[in-house]
Design a protein with these regions (language model features):
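Short coil/linker segments at helix-helix boundaries
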Residues: 22-77, 81-163, 170-207, 212-226, ...
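Register position in tetratricopeptide repeats
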Residues: 56, 90, 177, 221, ...
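TPR/TPR-like (Sel1-like) alpha-helical repeat modules
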Residues: 78, 85, 89, 99-116, ...
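C-terminal structured "cap/appendage" subdomains that terminate the fold
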Residues: 458-528
């Protein structure tokens, strides 16, 4: 992009790799290539570009502080107050309820200052009016209404200034945000629209951090993830100063089952943001898929230390993007994944809830219910199912329909496996299929990017248990289309093929499992079984 400047933070930062804890020097840090022209003091322009670059990588509160510093030296710069206002929005990808009352009040004040400061160009006045559209009457208008109004306002800015790449990038982000408040679209029309806009920006400026970041979000769905791979491979190198830029590529890597790449990305993120539980969750999940249980356990232990040293609220708040819910869910998901992925049912049954948020607690109660049902403690399973029911009802009362449905899915699955343990096979398979169908009809949330347990895979597990290997194979293969390169998916598909009389397909899936776990640090029984099968002539 002509006229752009390369945003560089001077200085050398030592980083701590997760596994070795040895310090190594990082290169001079960058935030990407951003140029957002403003009619302010000449000295303000590079500072403003730097602050916008931080904003594009969701680097809170550093970006907010950067705008605030500009306001001290150039208080007549209207757009700096726009920057403060938009930075107060909270992470736009997390969804409802959005920013809290205090942040909203501060944002309204900043937007008002932006308007009263008298922006010198119509373009600047249009940006300010757009963000005011988001905040106006926030006490009376719900989050969804404000998000959609802002999307329309940014569309108008984008159409009025077709040569302004920042208008394009912020409009694409508004589209991405609107996806979270609308029903799932099987055609992904909005996501593809945002992606097309961002791809055009990247063609002119390949190192624009916002275009790279929001493109990954636009394609952050299993059906689209391949299209975000090029951006994922580039983003961390373009803006390594921002912890989220180092982590964000792992969204794509997880969707595609690229576990070594996910681990590398999250090691980098954790090296600069050591309390980043969301990144730690991704890393533990990736290790578990490759049967690197010793490495995964280190992540579990690190999670325990985060909780001990900071408490749930402090550890969740350490998320550098401000996505506190993603922190809470990560803290609960890490030990749950460690038990479930290893089939350690008694361990899963004994997990203790952190009692942070209902959404996070539901993860623990679901794992406890499944662990109890699979280990034969049906009374405990029923008690945990009741806890899930109470959480679901509470979420419905506050009109949090999305998360209420996610808990409903968990509850149906837990009831299904409890019913199976009671000998009610037909009821069990019916309920489990309901859970799988419900999950297929909903989208994953960035606060739980890697779903704890793909329900269609879990349906395959149940069908194997009730001696329907042919049907089980169909479900495993369907699950692997969306949850790629999963250890339990490959093993289940291999076992189902073997038991349904398809040795060729069984060999294919056992081989995939062995290749996936070529660097395993633990000899899991399923892996030993796969190697034994493949050794047969």
């Amino acid at each position: 992009m002509k006229g752009g400047i390369l945003i560089v933070i001077l200085g050398i930062l030592c980083w701590v790799p997760v596994a070795t804890a040895q310090e190594k020097p990082r290169d001079a840090e960058k935030l990407g290539n951003v140029h957002f022209p403003v009619s302010c003091l000449p000295a303000t322009q590079p500072q403003f570009d730097r602050a916008v670059a931080m904003l594009h990588s969701f680097w809170y509160p550093q970006g907010l502080n950067a705008f605030a510093e500009i306001a001290k030296t150039d208080p007549s710069c209207a757009m700096v107050y726009w920057g403060i206002a938009i930075s107060r929005r909270a992470n736009p990808m997390v969804g409802a309820p959005g920013a809290g009352p205090d942040a909203l009040k501060d944002a309204v004040e900043a937007a008002g200052k932006a308007r009263l400061a008298g922006a010198k160009t119509q373009r600047e006045r249009d940006y300010i009016a757009a963000i005011e559209t988001y905040y106006n009457d926030w006490e009376k208008r719900d989050y969804r209404t404000r998000v959609l109004a802002y999307e329309k306002a940014m569309e108008d800015v984008y159409l009025h200034y077709p040569e302004d790449p920042e208008a394009a990038v912020f409009y694409a982000l508004a589209i991405d945000e609107a996806v979270n408040v609308l029903p799932p679209d099987p055609n992904f029309a909005r996501q593809q629209k945002a992606g097309a806009i961002l791809e055009k920006v990247l063609a002119a400026n390949p190192e624009h951090p916002g275009a790279l970041h929001y493109l990954i979000h636009a394609y952050d769905f299993p059906q689209l993830a391949d299209r975000g791979l090029a951006a994922a491979r580039q983003y961390g190198d373009v803006a390594p100063a921002a912890p989220h830029a180092l982590h964000m590529p792992s969204h794509t890597y997880s969707m595609l089952g690229m576990w070594p790449e996910s681990i590398k990305a999250n090691q980098a993120a954790l090296s600069v943001s050591k309390g980043y539980a969301h990144a730690l969750d991704f890393m533990v999940y990736a290790y578990l898929q490759m049967a690197q249980d010793i490495e995964a356990k280190r992540g579990v232990d690190r999670n325990i230390e985060l909780l001990k040293s900071q408490g749930a609220a402090g550890a969740a708040a350490a998320n550098p993007t401000g996505a506190v819910l993603a922190g809470y869910t990560a803290l609960a998901a890490i030990p749950a994944r460690y038990a479930i992925e290893r089939g350690a049912w008694t361990e899963a049954a004994g997990l203790q809830p952190v009692h942070s948020t209902p959404v996070a607690d539901s993860i623990t109660y679901f794992a406890r219910a499944m662990g109890s049902a699979r280990s034969g403690n049906l009374d405990a399973a029923r008690k945990n199912i009741e806890q899930l029911k109470q959480i679901e009802e509470g979420l419905l009362q506050v009109k949090d329909d999305y998360w209420a449905q996610q808990v409903e899915i968990q509850r149906n699955a837990a009831i299904a496996w409890t019913a199976y343990a009671e000998g009610k096979k037909d009821a069990a398979t019916k309920l489990m299929r309901t859970a799988a169908d419900l999950e297929d009809g909903s989208e994953k949330h960035v606060a739980m990017e890697n779903r704890l347990w793909p329900m269609r895979e879990l349906l395959g597990d149940l069908l194997l248990e009730v001696n329907e290997p042919g049907l089980a194979l169909k479900e495993y293969e369907a699950s692997l289309q969306l949850a790629r390169n999963r250890y339990r998916g490959f093993y289940g598909a291999a076992k189902a093929a073997q038991r349904s009389g398809d040795p060729g397909k069984a060999r294919i899936y056992y081989d995939k499992l062995v290749v996936l776990c070529s660097k395993a640090d633990t000899q899991r029984p399923e892996l030993a079984e796969a190697k034994k099968y493949l050794a047969q002539k």
